[in-house]
């Protein structure tokens, strides 16, 4: 039982990060009906920019508290990622809105490779240590037993889940109850009619990409804080998994991204925790990535609209 609880805790923490990344995919798809495969690499830029900003602040203001350094650095990274996302939309996607669907897909992959290459040149190939901001001492949530150790959680993990849920809830409220949200839904439904109603589709699309960039920066810092390092390649695989989470929940739907992210994290954690036992050691936890792609294949085959269905996914 302690092992099960531990894997569920791990899954919720991991799934919160996936869900936050998936929001970027689902927002863009909801409006433009394209998949921004450069989104995961914007996450990477956010994490590495935060790290560079912390190092610069530590050099310039050595007595500044580390938590304050993180706040300032995160604000800088969010601004950088928002501008980067706007640039990606402007130069990689805007002229391809009416092109065949394969064209923006190839363009997004090209931007992804470009961002990774530039990041590798700036920050080198080697993973860089990310500073420990919050206490990493484990907190026991169960008493354990003679067979299983107690299930644990860290302060960083708790903050990750709480912050992700708060951000996701805030986005849902923004989309449902604000003028900007009404504009986003109008453009998603019919850009031409939205224009006749006084909505500027280009401005809405630009803001959507910017918000996605901010979320990517936050997710990148969450990942780097939990794993203790950041690298030029850190965004690709989580980006693909977050895309899987968006498809699982119903791509284009904000609630679907939340649900899909949490579910995918739990599935992956349970698979990693029990795969070795079920296969008698033939496969270990290093095969956990297989579960994410199995989920993607199964959803595309049996329920392409995702868990929340085509109607809801289309409207969000």
Positions of the model-derived regions?
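Alpha-helical transmembrane segments within multi-pass membrane transporters and channels
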Residues: 25, 62-111, 118, 259-264, ...
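Transmembrane helix-bundle core of multi-pass membrane transporters
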Residues: 96, 104-177, 204, 270-289, ...
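Helix-loop-helix "hairpin" substructures at the membrane interface of multi-pass membrane proteins
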Residues: 14, 149-230, 254-260
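Pore- or pathway-lining transmembrane helices of multi-pass membrane proteins that form conduits
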Residues: 41-45, 96-120, 234-247, 263, ...
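Membrane-embedded helix boundary and interhelical linker motif in transport proteins
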Residues: 31-87, 91, 150, 274-282
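Membrane-interfacial amphipathic/re-entrant helices at transmembrane-helix boundaries
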Residues: 1-22, 49, 60-73, 99-103, ...
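Single transmembrane alpha-helix segments in multi-pass membrane proteins
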Residues: 4-53, 87-103, 246-254
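Inter-helical junctions in multi-pass inner-membrane proteins, predominant
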Residues: 2-10, 14-17, 174-179, 205-249, ...
């Amino acid at each position: 039982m302690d092992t099960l609880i531990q894997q569920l805790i791990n899954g919720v923490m991991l799934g919160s990060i996936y869900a936050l990344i998936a929001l970027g995919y689902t927002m863009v798809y909801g409006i433009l009906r394209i998949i921004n495969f450069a989104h995961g690499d914007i996450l990477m830029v956010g994490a590495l920019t935060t790290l560079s900003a912390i190092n610069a602040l530590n050099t310039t203001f050595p007595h500044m508290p580390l938590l304050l350094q993180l706040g300032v650095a995160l604000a800088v990274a969010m601004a950088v990622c928002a501008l980067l996302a706007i640039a990606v939309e402007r130069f990689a996607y805007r002229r391809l809105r009416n092109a065949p669907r394969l064209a923006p897909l190839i363009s997004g992959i090209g931007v992804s490779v470009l961002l990774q290459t530039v990041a590798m040149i700036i920050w080198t190939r080697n993973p860089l240590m990310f500073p420990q901001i919050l206490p990493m001492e484990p907190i026991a949530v169960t008493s354990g037993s003679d067979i299983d150790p107690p299930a644990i959680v860290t302060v960083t993990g708790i903050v990750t889940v709480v912050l992700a849920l708060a951000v996701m809830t805030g986005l849902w409220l923004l989309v449902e109850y604000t003028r900007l949200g009404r504009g986003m839904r109008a453009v998603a439904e019919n850009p031409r009619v939205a224009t006749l109603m006084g909505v500027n589709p280009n401005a809405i699309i630009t803001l959507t990409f910017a918000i996605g960039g901010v979320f990517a920066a936050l997710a990148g810092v969450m990942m780097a804080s939990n794993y203790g390092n950041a690298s030029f390649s850190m965004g690709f695989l989580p980006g693909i998994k977050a895309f899987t989470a968006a498809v699982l929940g119903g791509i284009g739907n904000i609630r679907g991204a939340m649900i899909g992210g949490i579910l995918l994290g739990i599935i992956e954690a349970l698979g990693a925790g029990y795969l070795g036992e079920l296969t008698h050691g033939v496969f270990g936890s290093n095969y956990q990535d297989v579960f994410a792609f199995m989920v993607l294949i199964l959803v595309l085959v049996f329920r392409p609209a995702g868990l929340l269905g085509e109607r809801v996914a289309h409207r969000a």
